[in-house]
Amino acid sequence: MPDSITNGGRPPAPPSSVSSTTASTTGNFGTRRRLVNRIKKVDELHPAQENPTMGSHWLSEQERSRLEAVQQDWRRTRPMKFQWTSKKRPDDPTTSSPSTVSISNALENSTPSLNNVSSITNSSSPFSLSSAATSTASAIIPFTSNVATNHPHLNHHVSRIPQAIVTGGTNGSLPPLLISPTSAAAATPLISGKAGPMSPSTGSPINVAATVLQNAVSSPQHSIFDRSRLNKIPPNTSLASSSSPSDAANNDKPIQQRHSILSNVRTLTQAMVNDGPRTLTGDDMDKMVSEEERARKEQEKREEEEKAARRIDVEDDFDAQEKPIDKSKNGRFLKFDEELGRGSFKTVFRGLDTETGVAVAWCELQESKLNKTERQRFREEAEMLKDLQHPNIVRFYDYWESADLCGKRKYIVLVTELMTSGTLKMYLKRFKRINIKVLKSWCRQILKGLSFLHTRNPPVIHRDLKCDNIFITGTTGSVKIGDLGLATLKNKSFAKSVIGTPEFMAPEMYEEMYDESVDVYAFGMCLLEMVTGEYPYSECMNPATIYRKVISGVKPECFSRIPAQYPEIREIIDRCIRVRREERSTVKQLLVDDFFTPEDLIGIRVEIKNRDADLNDLNVEIQMQLRVYDEKKRKQYRFKENEGLQFAFDIENDSPDEVVQQMIEQQHIPDEDTRMITKLIKDKVDAFRRDRDHRLLEIKRAKEEEERIREEAEIKEELRLRAEAKEKEKERLEKERLEKKAAAAAAANPNPTPIPPTPATPHSSAQQQPIPPPLSTQTSAEIQQSAQQPSVPVTMIANIPAMSPTSAQPQPVLSPTSAAVPVPTTMIHVPKPSEIPVQNVATTAAPVAANNVPPSPAPFKTEDIQTPTLAQNTVPRTISTDASGLVINTPASIASPSPAPSATDVASTTAPVTPAPTPTTTTDGGAAAASTTTENKEEKRKSNKRKVVMEILGCDESRNFALVSCRLDTSHKSVTFQFAPGTDKPCTIATKLLAEDCLLKVHVHIVEAQLGEVIQLINSDGKKGVGTKLATVLDPNSTEPPTITAVMPKDSSAATASNTKPKIEIEKTPPTRDASQEPNNVQVTNVRKVSQESNAESVQSIPRPGGIIVMSPTNQTDSAPPPTGAAAKPSRFQVTKSADPIATPISSSISTATVIPIVAATPTNITSEPVIVQPITAQVITHLATPSPVSHSLSSNSSPSATTHSNMSSIQSTTSVPGRRFTVQPVSQAESGISSSISTPHPEPTPAITSCPPPVPSVPPVVSNGTLNLEVAPKQTPSATNQNVDTQHSSSTASTATLVSETPATVHVTPISVPAPVQEPLVIDHHSDVLTQLDSELRKCFQVSGVSHSASPSTVVESLTSMTPQTIPLACQTVPASIGQAPAVIAAAHAASLIPNASVPQSPSRLDAETGLAGLHEKLEALKMEQDRREDMGDDAIGTTTTDGKDEIPIDTLKGLAEALGKVIHADGRETTPMPPDHPDLTDASTQQLISPSNPDVLTTMSSAVEGSASSTMIEDIDASTSAVDASMMNSMPPGAQNSTDQIPAAMTLSMDQECAQSMTSSITRNTTGTKLATFENLETALSSTLGTHIRQPNAPSSRDETTAPMTPSFTNERIGGGGGGGATSFSIGTPPSHSPFPVSECDYDLKGQMDLESEDPEVIQMIVRHRMEQHKLLEKQRVEIERLRSKIRVPRATSVNPEMIGDDEADTTLTALQSALGNASLSLPASPPPNTEIPDNEGQHHCNSFRCIGDPNDNVSIVNQIKQRLGIIPSSRQSVRSATSSSPSTPPSSSSAPPKSLSSPTKSYVSHCSLSIGYGSTASSEQQQREPSPSATTSSFLSDPATGVIENV
């Protein structure tokens, strides 16, 4: 057989001589490539139609390729004469015949020898052709390049020779092989003769046969298993048959022609092999060229015809695909022969729903592995799945069971919705990152689909949710969950690896016990894959590894690669993939999560402030914030875009419905959003509860795991020690046996030789290991006895002369130490004998008592010795000696304490043993040194042991709960404390003791264990447990847990010990954060500590009791028990900056207690000397703004709700009226630091004041967006009176009030235009009871806590005006250098009335609005005093409006006063007002040197008088204070200042503007932020109107976008008498006008000062008018309500006014200056009253603004004037006015001095009104307008009437 056949059809390698000629055969590859492309196109356009019985639709790709390979191998072994190889071709037999015949003839006629060879081609055997072809391997056919180039068809036929020989090639197919022609560019001319064709490149002959055979082997082979080529095969790619030419001619003429050509070629090649190469003649070549051209044209024509036929076939195939191949039983669904997908469990075909015309998915499932039961279960579940219709669930239409045509194979058909856009997995591969909005949308839809499944009855569990089963519709973006039926089948049908995808399977799925939570777990893994783009657990190599990680709770590695900017996604995934299914979130809970809630759908969010901190604590109260994102909805709310409504919520007691109802009542939210906000709060609280429970469970579980590990380690250690002890015991017995044997031998031998010592056994490890207590009762010799010490009797078993082997002289075994130390103790801990080697006993024994004793070789006398043990028990021991050493045996049982040894023994004391290194001479020196070191270690261990003893002193069961008194004795200190065993936990008590520095950290666990025992004893029998002592010895060197030893009392006398012992009282409170965790902050001294929240350095996870009152042993007083009254629920809402981390409680909502008022001594010179107004200095503000370490830690680490509960309350509120719990705060403001709007134009060095006591903790930082201008006079009188203060921490503010020191000071205070942080109210001692009662009643009314960490700025003034620099903390002494240069005269009390009250809710500051009533008595007193002063001056006009009395509220009682204030102080929404810009300092030196009174006692009088308003004795203080202020202020003014009233307001204004930012510089550095003044205008206006002080002089613009024009010196001339340059001012005492003369909206500042309203829009004007009407209504209502109050307090006015101290002229001048200074106050109006559409005309307004004559005795004359008139001491008020107006150097000519008329004249009436240019304001009289110096109608100023001296406001 030829080599080509034996080699598998591969031809032999061509000869080396012609191997290089094959490179020229690559020219025809282009034609072959085109043919291959045509065949591929045929495959694509017309796929093979397979037999239905053996179709490939049920085979996978791998199986199909394997089948084809088998078929090819089979066909390769079959003969070629088959019908499928000789089918008719659609070729025209007439087209190719001439060319092929002519070429054949040309080849046959070329040489006569070809005929001899041509017979080979007629052979019917296929091998004959092979042999012939093989023999021509070396034949060379002479072709020219032209023939090869111009006749590719001939070359193609020639190239097929080897393919016909090898019977179909390697795989039975015929590739299009070509002989590569030579290049046309390098073509060579014909060479006649014997020269064969030459290669153009090498010049060597071309081996055609070798090239043909090589192409046949190396060309790509194509599969013949393609029916498209069986029916229609191109002529150039048809199979070459090996049949004879005669058969081919009968069947297929084109094939016959082809074979004839090939036969001729083979004959020619054979001839060339035999005869050698020869060249073709010219005629032969011409014929060949012409035939080839004709054949090529005919081939092109056939190709065109084939293309047209293919197009027709494609159309026919498409029609065939639309023909259904199967249908459902009911005929509704059709199946088409179009496979869409294939999986391990199903095959999906395209289907059609004939009812709807929608394409569906026809899924065929294998049923062979389902048993009968599982089929039945699937039928039931499939029926249920048919009813599931949801937009996010792939629709399940129908199912049935079917069989194939033969009926052998059964399968289940599922018809579902067809999803053509792809799966989520495909999208994740296509897009590396998904947009967060898209991710939210997809997750939301997935959760909706799962929620629909889980809410069915029964719930439907998907079981196989993963990204491959989630389908996405690309056109709409909708997501649907699919493969529900498959998940149902996969439940229990297959192996566990097939139940689901291991990466997405929950741990319980492996145990086949699961519920809907497995879908939540799978969703978490899907979300993880969507976020990270990584497959979960891709790091695992097999399902077993995944299983181990899943069940152990190890998260995938990609979990750590979640983007850091999405912490909420990490939290959601963590909640979904928890190991315990009960800890996972449900689908419903995930749907309500904020992350999946679209903002455009709801527009409102509820957030929890400091959520992480609250999760770790047990606070029942959390701070929540409501924010509005929808701009349309925001218009209905009372806060702005960057603000949120913050409120406190008690998760145990509060109800979302109640909280939302309070919001509606306080007009924070509209009614239509009630249900939505209620649901948001409820969902948020439920999620918080669930997360907190999980967090606590995790902490508990971690502790349990640690405890379990520790116990296991202890058990292992104990077992190991026991094993070692057993070994040692065996060694000891062996040694004893040897010793006895040696002793017997020594006794038998009287003159023994020295016996060498026994080799030491390894014992180093035993010496280091502690022995358990049961095994530590045996001891070895630790007491080294001298050989001649007679005081310790020793019984010797054997007397052995102990001689050292290295010494020539004999030495005793027990040699004395060189420096023995006496041991004055009997308490010795003796370890086991086996711990010390026998031969080293003598050297390791401790010295007992000896001096240097000479050694004695004589034998020892054996005696007995008794050694007391640790428990002072005497245990007899027997000491036996031999040459090896000394052994002491001790009985295991310890007897009761025995008498001490005899007098000759060692003296017994309680001092511990103090071992010293004792060099000894023994038989083994190295062992002796090691033994000495061991001895020292043992003694050190003994000295390091400490004992913790707790004794139960008593149990008081008289209360509702038992109260146990205990005493704890430690090495640190002894302390006595009380606790309630029923409610207090040991860990809580121990933590409190540690916080109070009563306990060391190392003793915490011991004390907790002892307290647990105490609680058990008390619970079992409280009386019998009294007197029990629990002792625990703490050995730091031991790994064993300490053991508690209980000693029961012999009598019950110890039960009364608690009455004489100091104690720490731990009182139970609701679970809240413990703030007293710093031992350094609390000292056990004579200071009484009540605060439970003075500090909070870290978040605690356990509940703690309230406060621990630590008393020294000398202080025997008991603390008051906690109040039992019902706690009131105060106001909780506050609008806050929602972006701020609320560190300090913004609203002390739910606060149940108040701080006991701080009492200071009252000076005795209140009315005996001029009352001086205390300065409101920047030092004071600095002090208030400086956060204490306590408050700072509270604000940074503690929850805002942690400080809302107080254990010690001075008020027992029983009312439950809904108060103010909501506050509005900005969302973008920083936690601390002043507002960015505050600037510091004059940065100068700030001098420090050194006369200050040590700093006292103050309030936390507050926000202030306004300006505060406080100026100090150059002079101050430092005369301080030190007072003892009972310092008490506040649970709301964690701050300590400052001592009020009555120190006179000469200062001037400018109008305060910004609220400042405030301290607790300052209370005077002799009115403390009345003040406490009033404070309690007011707080009951308004539901506020007793202390405010952000009270109103007016409280700041009062609390600060009583402070001298001596009382300011050192940390608060940084003040601007400019302070004290430009002061202005103002009464501090009245300044307090100008500052708005903090009770206004919508303050954008960090002030706690609801606690703004702290210090309310100072405000009321200041307002009342100003009212009295105005009445004294007689410059108020009585309003014409009368009172009907229907709203009268009596205020002669505290309840009435509180009710009246409740009418005034209400929840009003306000918008903020920016600060006025800074202005240059235009004042001169003379103006800046104004001096104010020098006595600060006025505030003390004011504070005490107002709180005792119910008492008639306080009227004297009020009048005295008023007169003193008037007199002292006027007396302290320089002459220039008294004659220059116009300079006073200018000085005040300019100095305030100049020093505004500088006065706040220090507060900026202390993380304080200003509060915008305008937000407090509501309460100020209300209170001022109520008490008759209608003063309102704004100077700040209300618009955020507009600024105030800089003040110029021209304003100084315009503000005569206190007029403000930017706004009009009206003074009205008594009955207010029917129409308010004040600006009623923030825009009025701009309207009156800078804008011309004639060009304003009608909407703006309408809003202004509406605001004015609202103000008018409010003022009228307040006036009616308060009129009764005045009548109640007129009669009890005291007559103790000192006429000498009252200067009416000075007081009037002071009032004028005060009125001028008040023009700088930026105040606003309430927004809560309903709008009033009635707009009175100018005439009505003029009438309402007309006031009767000032000082008319018949019409509502002021109270003070009546009293003073009766006393005959009232001066003429016009003198002060005249002195204030006529002496001004800058007064206009119209206001020159003139004799004033009587102020009480009824004929004179001056209208005080506001002059505006908008047509609806009050119209000034022509006379007033003529005198008006203002250049414009919008500029107002104060003028003095030269005729009357009455100040008018134009």
From Swiss-Prot:
Residues 776-790, 1077-1101, 1208-1217, 1806-1820 have a biased composition (Polar residues). CDD domains: STKc_WNK (cd13983). It comes from the Eukaryota. Residues 693-749 form a coiled coil. Gene3D superfamilies: Phosphatidylinositol 3-kinase Catalytic Subunit, Chain A, domain 1 (3.10.20.90), Phosphorylase Kinase, domain 1 (3.30.200.20), Transferase(Phosphotransferase) domain 1 (1.10.510.10). Residues 334-596 form the Protein kinase domain. Residues 16-26, 234-251, 890-934, 1188-1207, 1771-1805, 1821-1832 have a biased composition (Low complexity). It is found in: Cytoplasm. Keywords: ATP-binding, Coiled coil, Cytoplasm, Developmental protein, Kinase, Nucleotide-binding, Serine/threonine-protein kinase, Transferase. One of its GO terms (molecular function) is potassium channel inhibitor activity. Residues 1-108, 221-253, 272-309, 727-790, 890-943, 1040-1130, 1188-1249, 1588-1636, 1721-1740, 1769-1850 are annotated as: Disordered. One of its GO terms (biological process) is positive regulation of gene expression. Interacts with gck-3 (via C-terminus). This is Serine/threonine-protein kinase WNK. It comes from Caenorhabditis elegans. The gene is wnk-1.
